[in-house]
Amino acid sequence: MMKHRIAAALALVAAPLLAQKCVNPHCDAQRLDFRDLGYPGATEIPADSSPITALMAHSNGRVYGATTGKSSHLFVWDSRVNKVFPLGRIADEKGVHHALVEGPGGVVFIGTGLSEIETLRLTRDMPEGRRAIETQLWKDIKAKYSSYAGGHVYAYDPKKGDGSVYLEGAAAQVADLGVPVPGNSVYALTISPDRKTLYGISYPDAELFSCDIAAKSFRRLGKWMEKLAYPGPERTWRGVPRALACTPDGNVWSSGDDGLLRAYVPSLGTFAETRMRIPGEYWETQAYNGFPVVEQLFAKDDGTLIGTTSDGFVFTAQPNADRLQSWGKPRVERRVRAATLGKDGRLYTICGERDNVCRLFSFRSDEGHLDWGVLGVDRSPYYAKIAYQFDAMATAADGTILIGESDRRAKLFMFIPGGEVMPGVLNPTNPR
């Protein structure tokens, strides 16, 4: 009798488990996994402060990341133990957006700001008139920063800070270098080839700045773009490039007004314009000032640029030849949310908008775009998760692709290249 009762109980428990199906990627599932951001109940970064918005591979073999939310936190992933270790709360900051850079001596520089992933509150009632919506939208965007002193640049030394244990609420061991652009967030950072100068762009005013690392001093270099455009898909966002890249000659590149690539030339102290226009939608038939911006941008050793756009395209550019080539887009939806250059010659990307599930893709010129699918991990009965939103990627020393989830209670995902997309692309075990 007891045996029958046990069997019946097991059947009741097993039935819903068998009915639930996790969505797996379009490759062998053991190539995808995730880790918590610390030890639950002890060091784990709080759920409302966990969305990952910056990742950076370090020369020490580890990968550093930062979060955005009620408070901003620093963390490190160590491949030797395959774990994430929180490194403390970054002062009183709310966010870090694409602004982690390794400098001289392995010091990590961190650009901070307000949360740039939260939904902005818009004015419901507004006066009528020419371009009234655009005018009010800019007022609403600026209102968020009206009482904000400005994002800081901090320095963190892994040699001094990595060995400590940071319980929940502990402060990160960072040194404050100051505020580069008052009333603005630091929106992106890069570093010069000689590793002596940081360059950054601010949001929402799109002002370029530099930081002399040795002198710990900032210079405001001027507006990167003058035009106010709201290309979307987020309709509460001013189109400001989310990445900068330094080529070997020291020039700083990104997209500017009207989607044209431009550079800051430090040797001359001036901006250089080009005719290289990034791919995307330009709304030529409408009385609307809209153009795409760079999402991610990487400079190769030969000076070639490879980047992505807010409309979801991948492109390469040869600045010395004033030549840009579009490689299309892997997904109908707009935005490349994150990207990183893999050790296998591929550009790995996360594509998708905020109201849908992001997917992992890769691009290489000899094979085009490959669809690796949704980032779903099923290790049931131990743990499982289908993640929707991502905003940061990095490539570890061994080639592992680290992907930062940017939802509440976020996890750090890891994808191990080397496998193949399944025949027919779609994983046949997924529900359809």
What are these regions (language model features)?
Residues 62-65, 108-109, 197-200, 251-254, ...:
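Conserved beta-propeller blade signature
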Residues 68-69, 113-115, 203, 257, ...:
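Short loop/turn segments immediately following the C-termini of beta-strands
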Residues 113-148, 352:
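Short, conserved, GDST-rich strand-edge loop motifs in beta-rich repeat architectures
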